[in-house]
Amino acid sequence: MDLGLALGAGGARNISFGHNMTTLNYTLSRGIGKALFPGDEILITQLDHEANRGPWLSLREEGVVVREVALLPDGTLDYDDLRTKINENTRLVAMGFSSNALGTVNEVGLVRELTHKVGAWLLVDAVHYAPHFPIDVNALGVDFLLCSAYKFYGTHIGVLYSRDGLLDRIPVYTLRTQEQHAPYCIETGTLNHAAIAGVKAAVEYISTFGTGETLRARIVSGMERIGEYEHILGREIYRGLKGIKGVEVVGPDFGKGKRVPTVSFTMEGMDPIDVCTLLDRRGICAWDGHFYAVRPIEVLGLLEKGGVTRVGVSLYNTADEVQRLLEAVTDIAEGKLRKE
């Protein structure tokens, strides 16, 4: 299976499909929850999308202790807080690879070391990371990784990677007629076979941007090439917005390590939804609010203010489009583009 190659997995046996990432994660959490006892602990973060918070928070009803790793004001996780909260009772750490709201890329390698040191599992939500960087699940050493194919030019279908033999040990809910082993045991009902075929096409499309003797090599180099291009455009947006009076960029600087090309900002005296409406007049697509990452927007004190305005780039965007965006935001800030 091409997707197994794309993620660096051992093969098709490690890849399960679902209607979306949220559904897969909820199904997985129900199974893991059946194997836990009152007093067992799960760690989540204040930076995550609700799809990687809600399924685990609901296990509190079963007596599972769910703790949050704190979010710092600069949009990064407090890893000292994580070190304080992870302990011998921790059974699972669920975290995002990158933030769809702030653009932050988390230190998965560090968290893996801390997680496996106490014998816990590490689950990573890579939905917002997968479109921008190559992934090697074996090198990462994660136990579970989830993503969504529509984010990397594919169809709307959820994907779950599980480490060899791990899914077979989890009592997920299955039908009598269902295959009782990985990868099928978590795949409920008839899958969208057309969407699965679309995933294969998306992976092959990405590989056309790369070079190498094998498909895996072409996928990796293709994603690296895409990521480098996107980084240049994203950095230009970040720096350009920082230079506009009345604009406050939310999230880590592009000069502080790896970052996805997603940039969120607020404008003095304006609601984010109004900023999006004005940008739309210039043919620019932006989104406002929390993007289902409610908790980080709430922690940063922005939820009651309508959240943030979010823009981002992909491989099909251009430097000219970035300049159009910056010119439009400048006009909004200077009152040249305003509500009628």
Go through the PLM ranges and name each one:
Residues M1-E340:
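Pyridoxal 5′-phosphate
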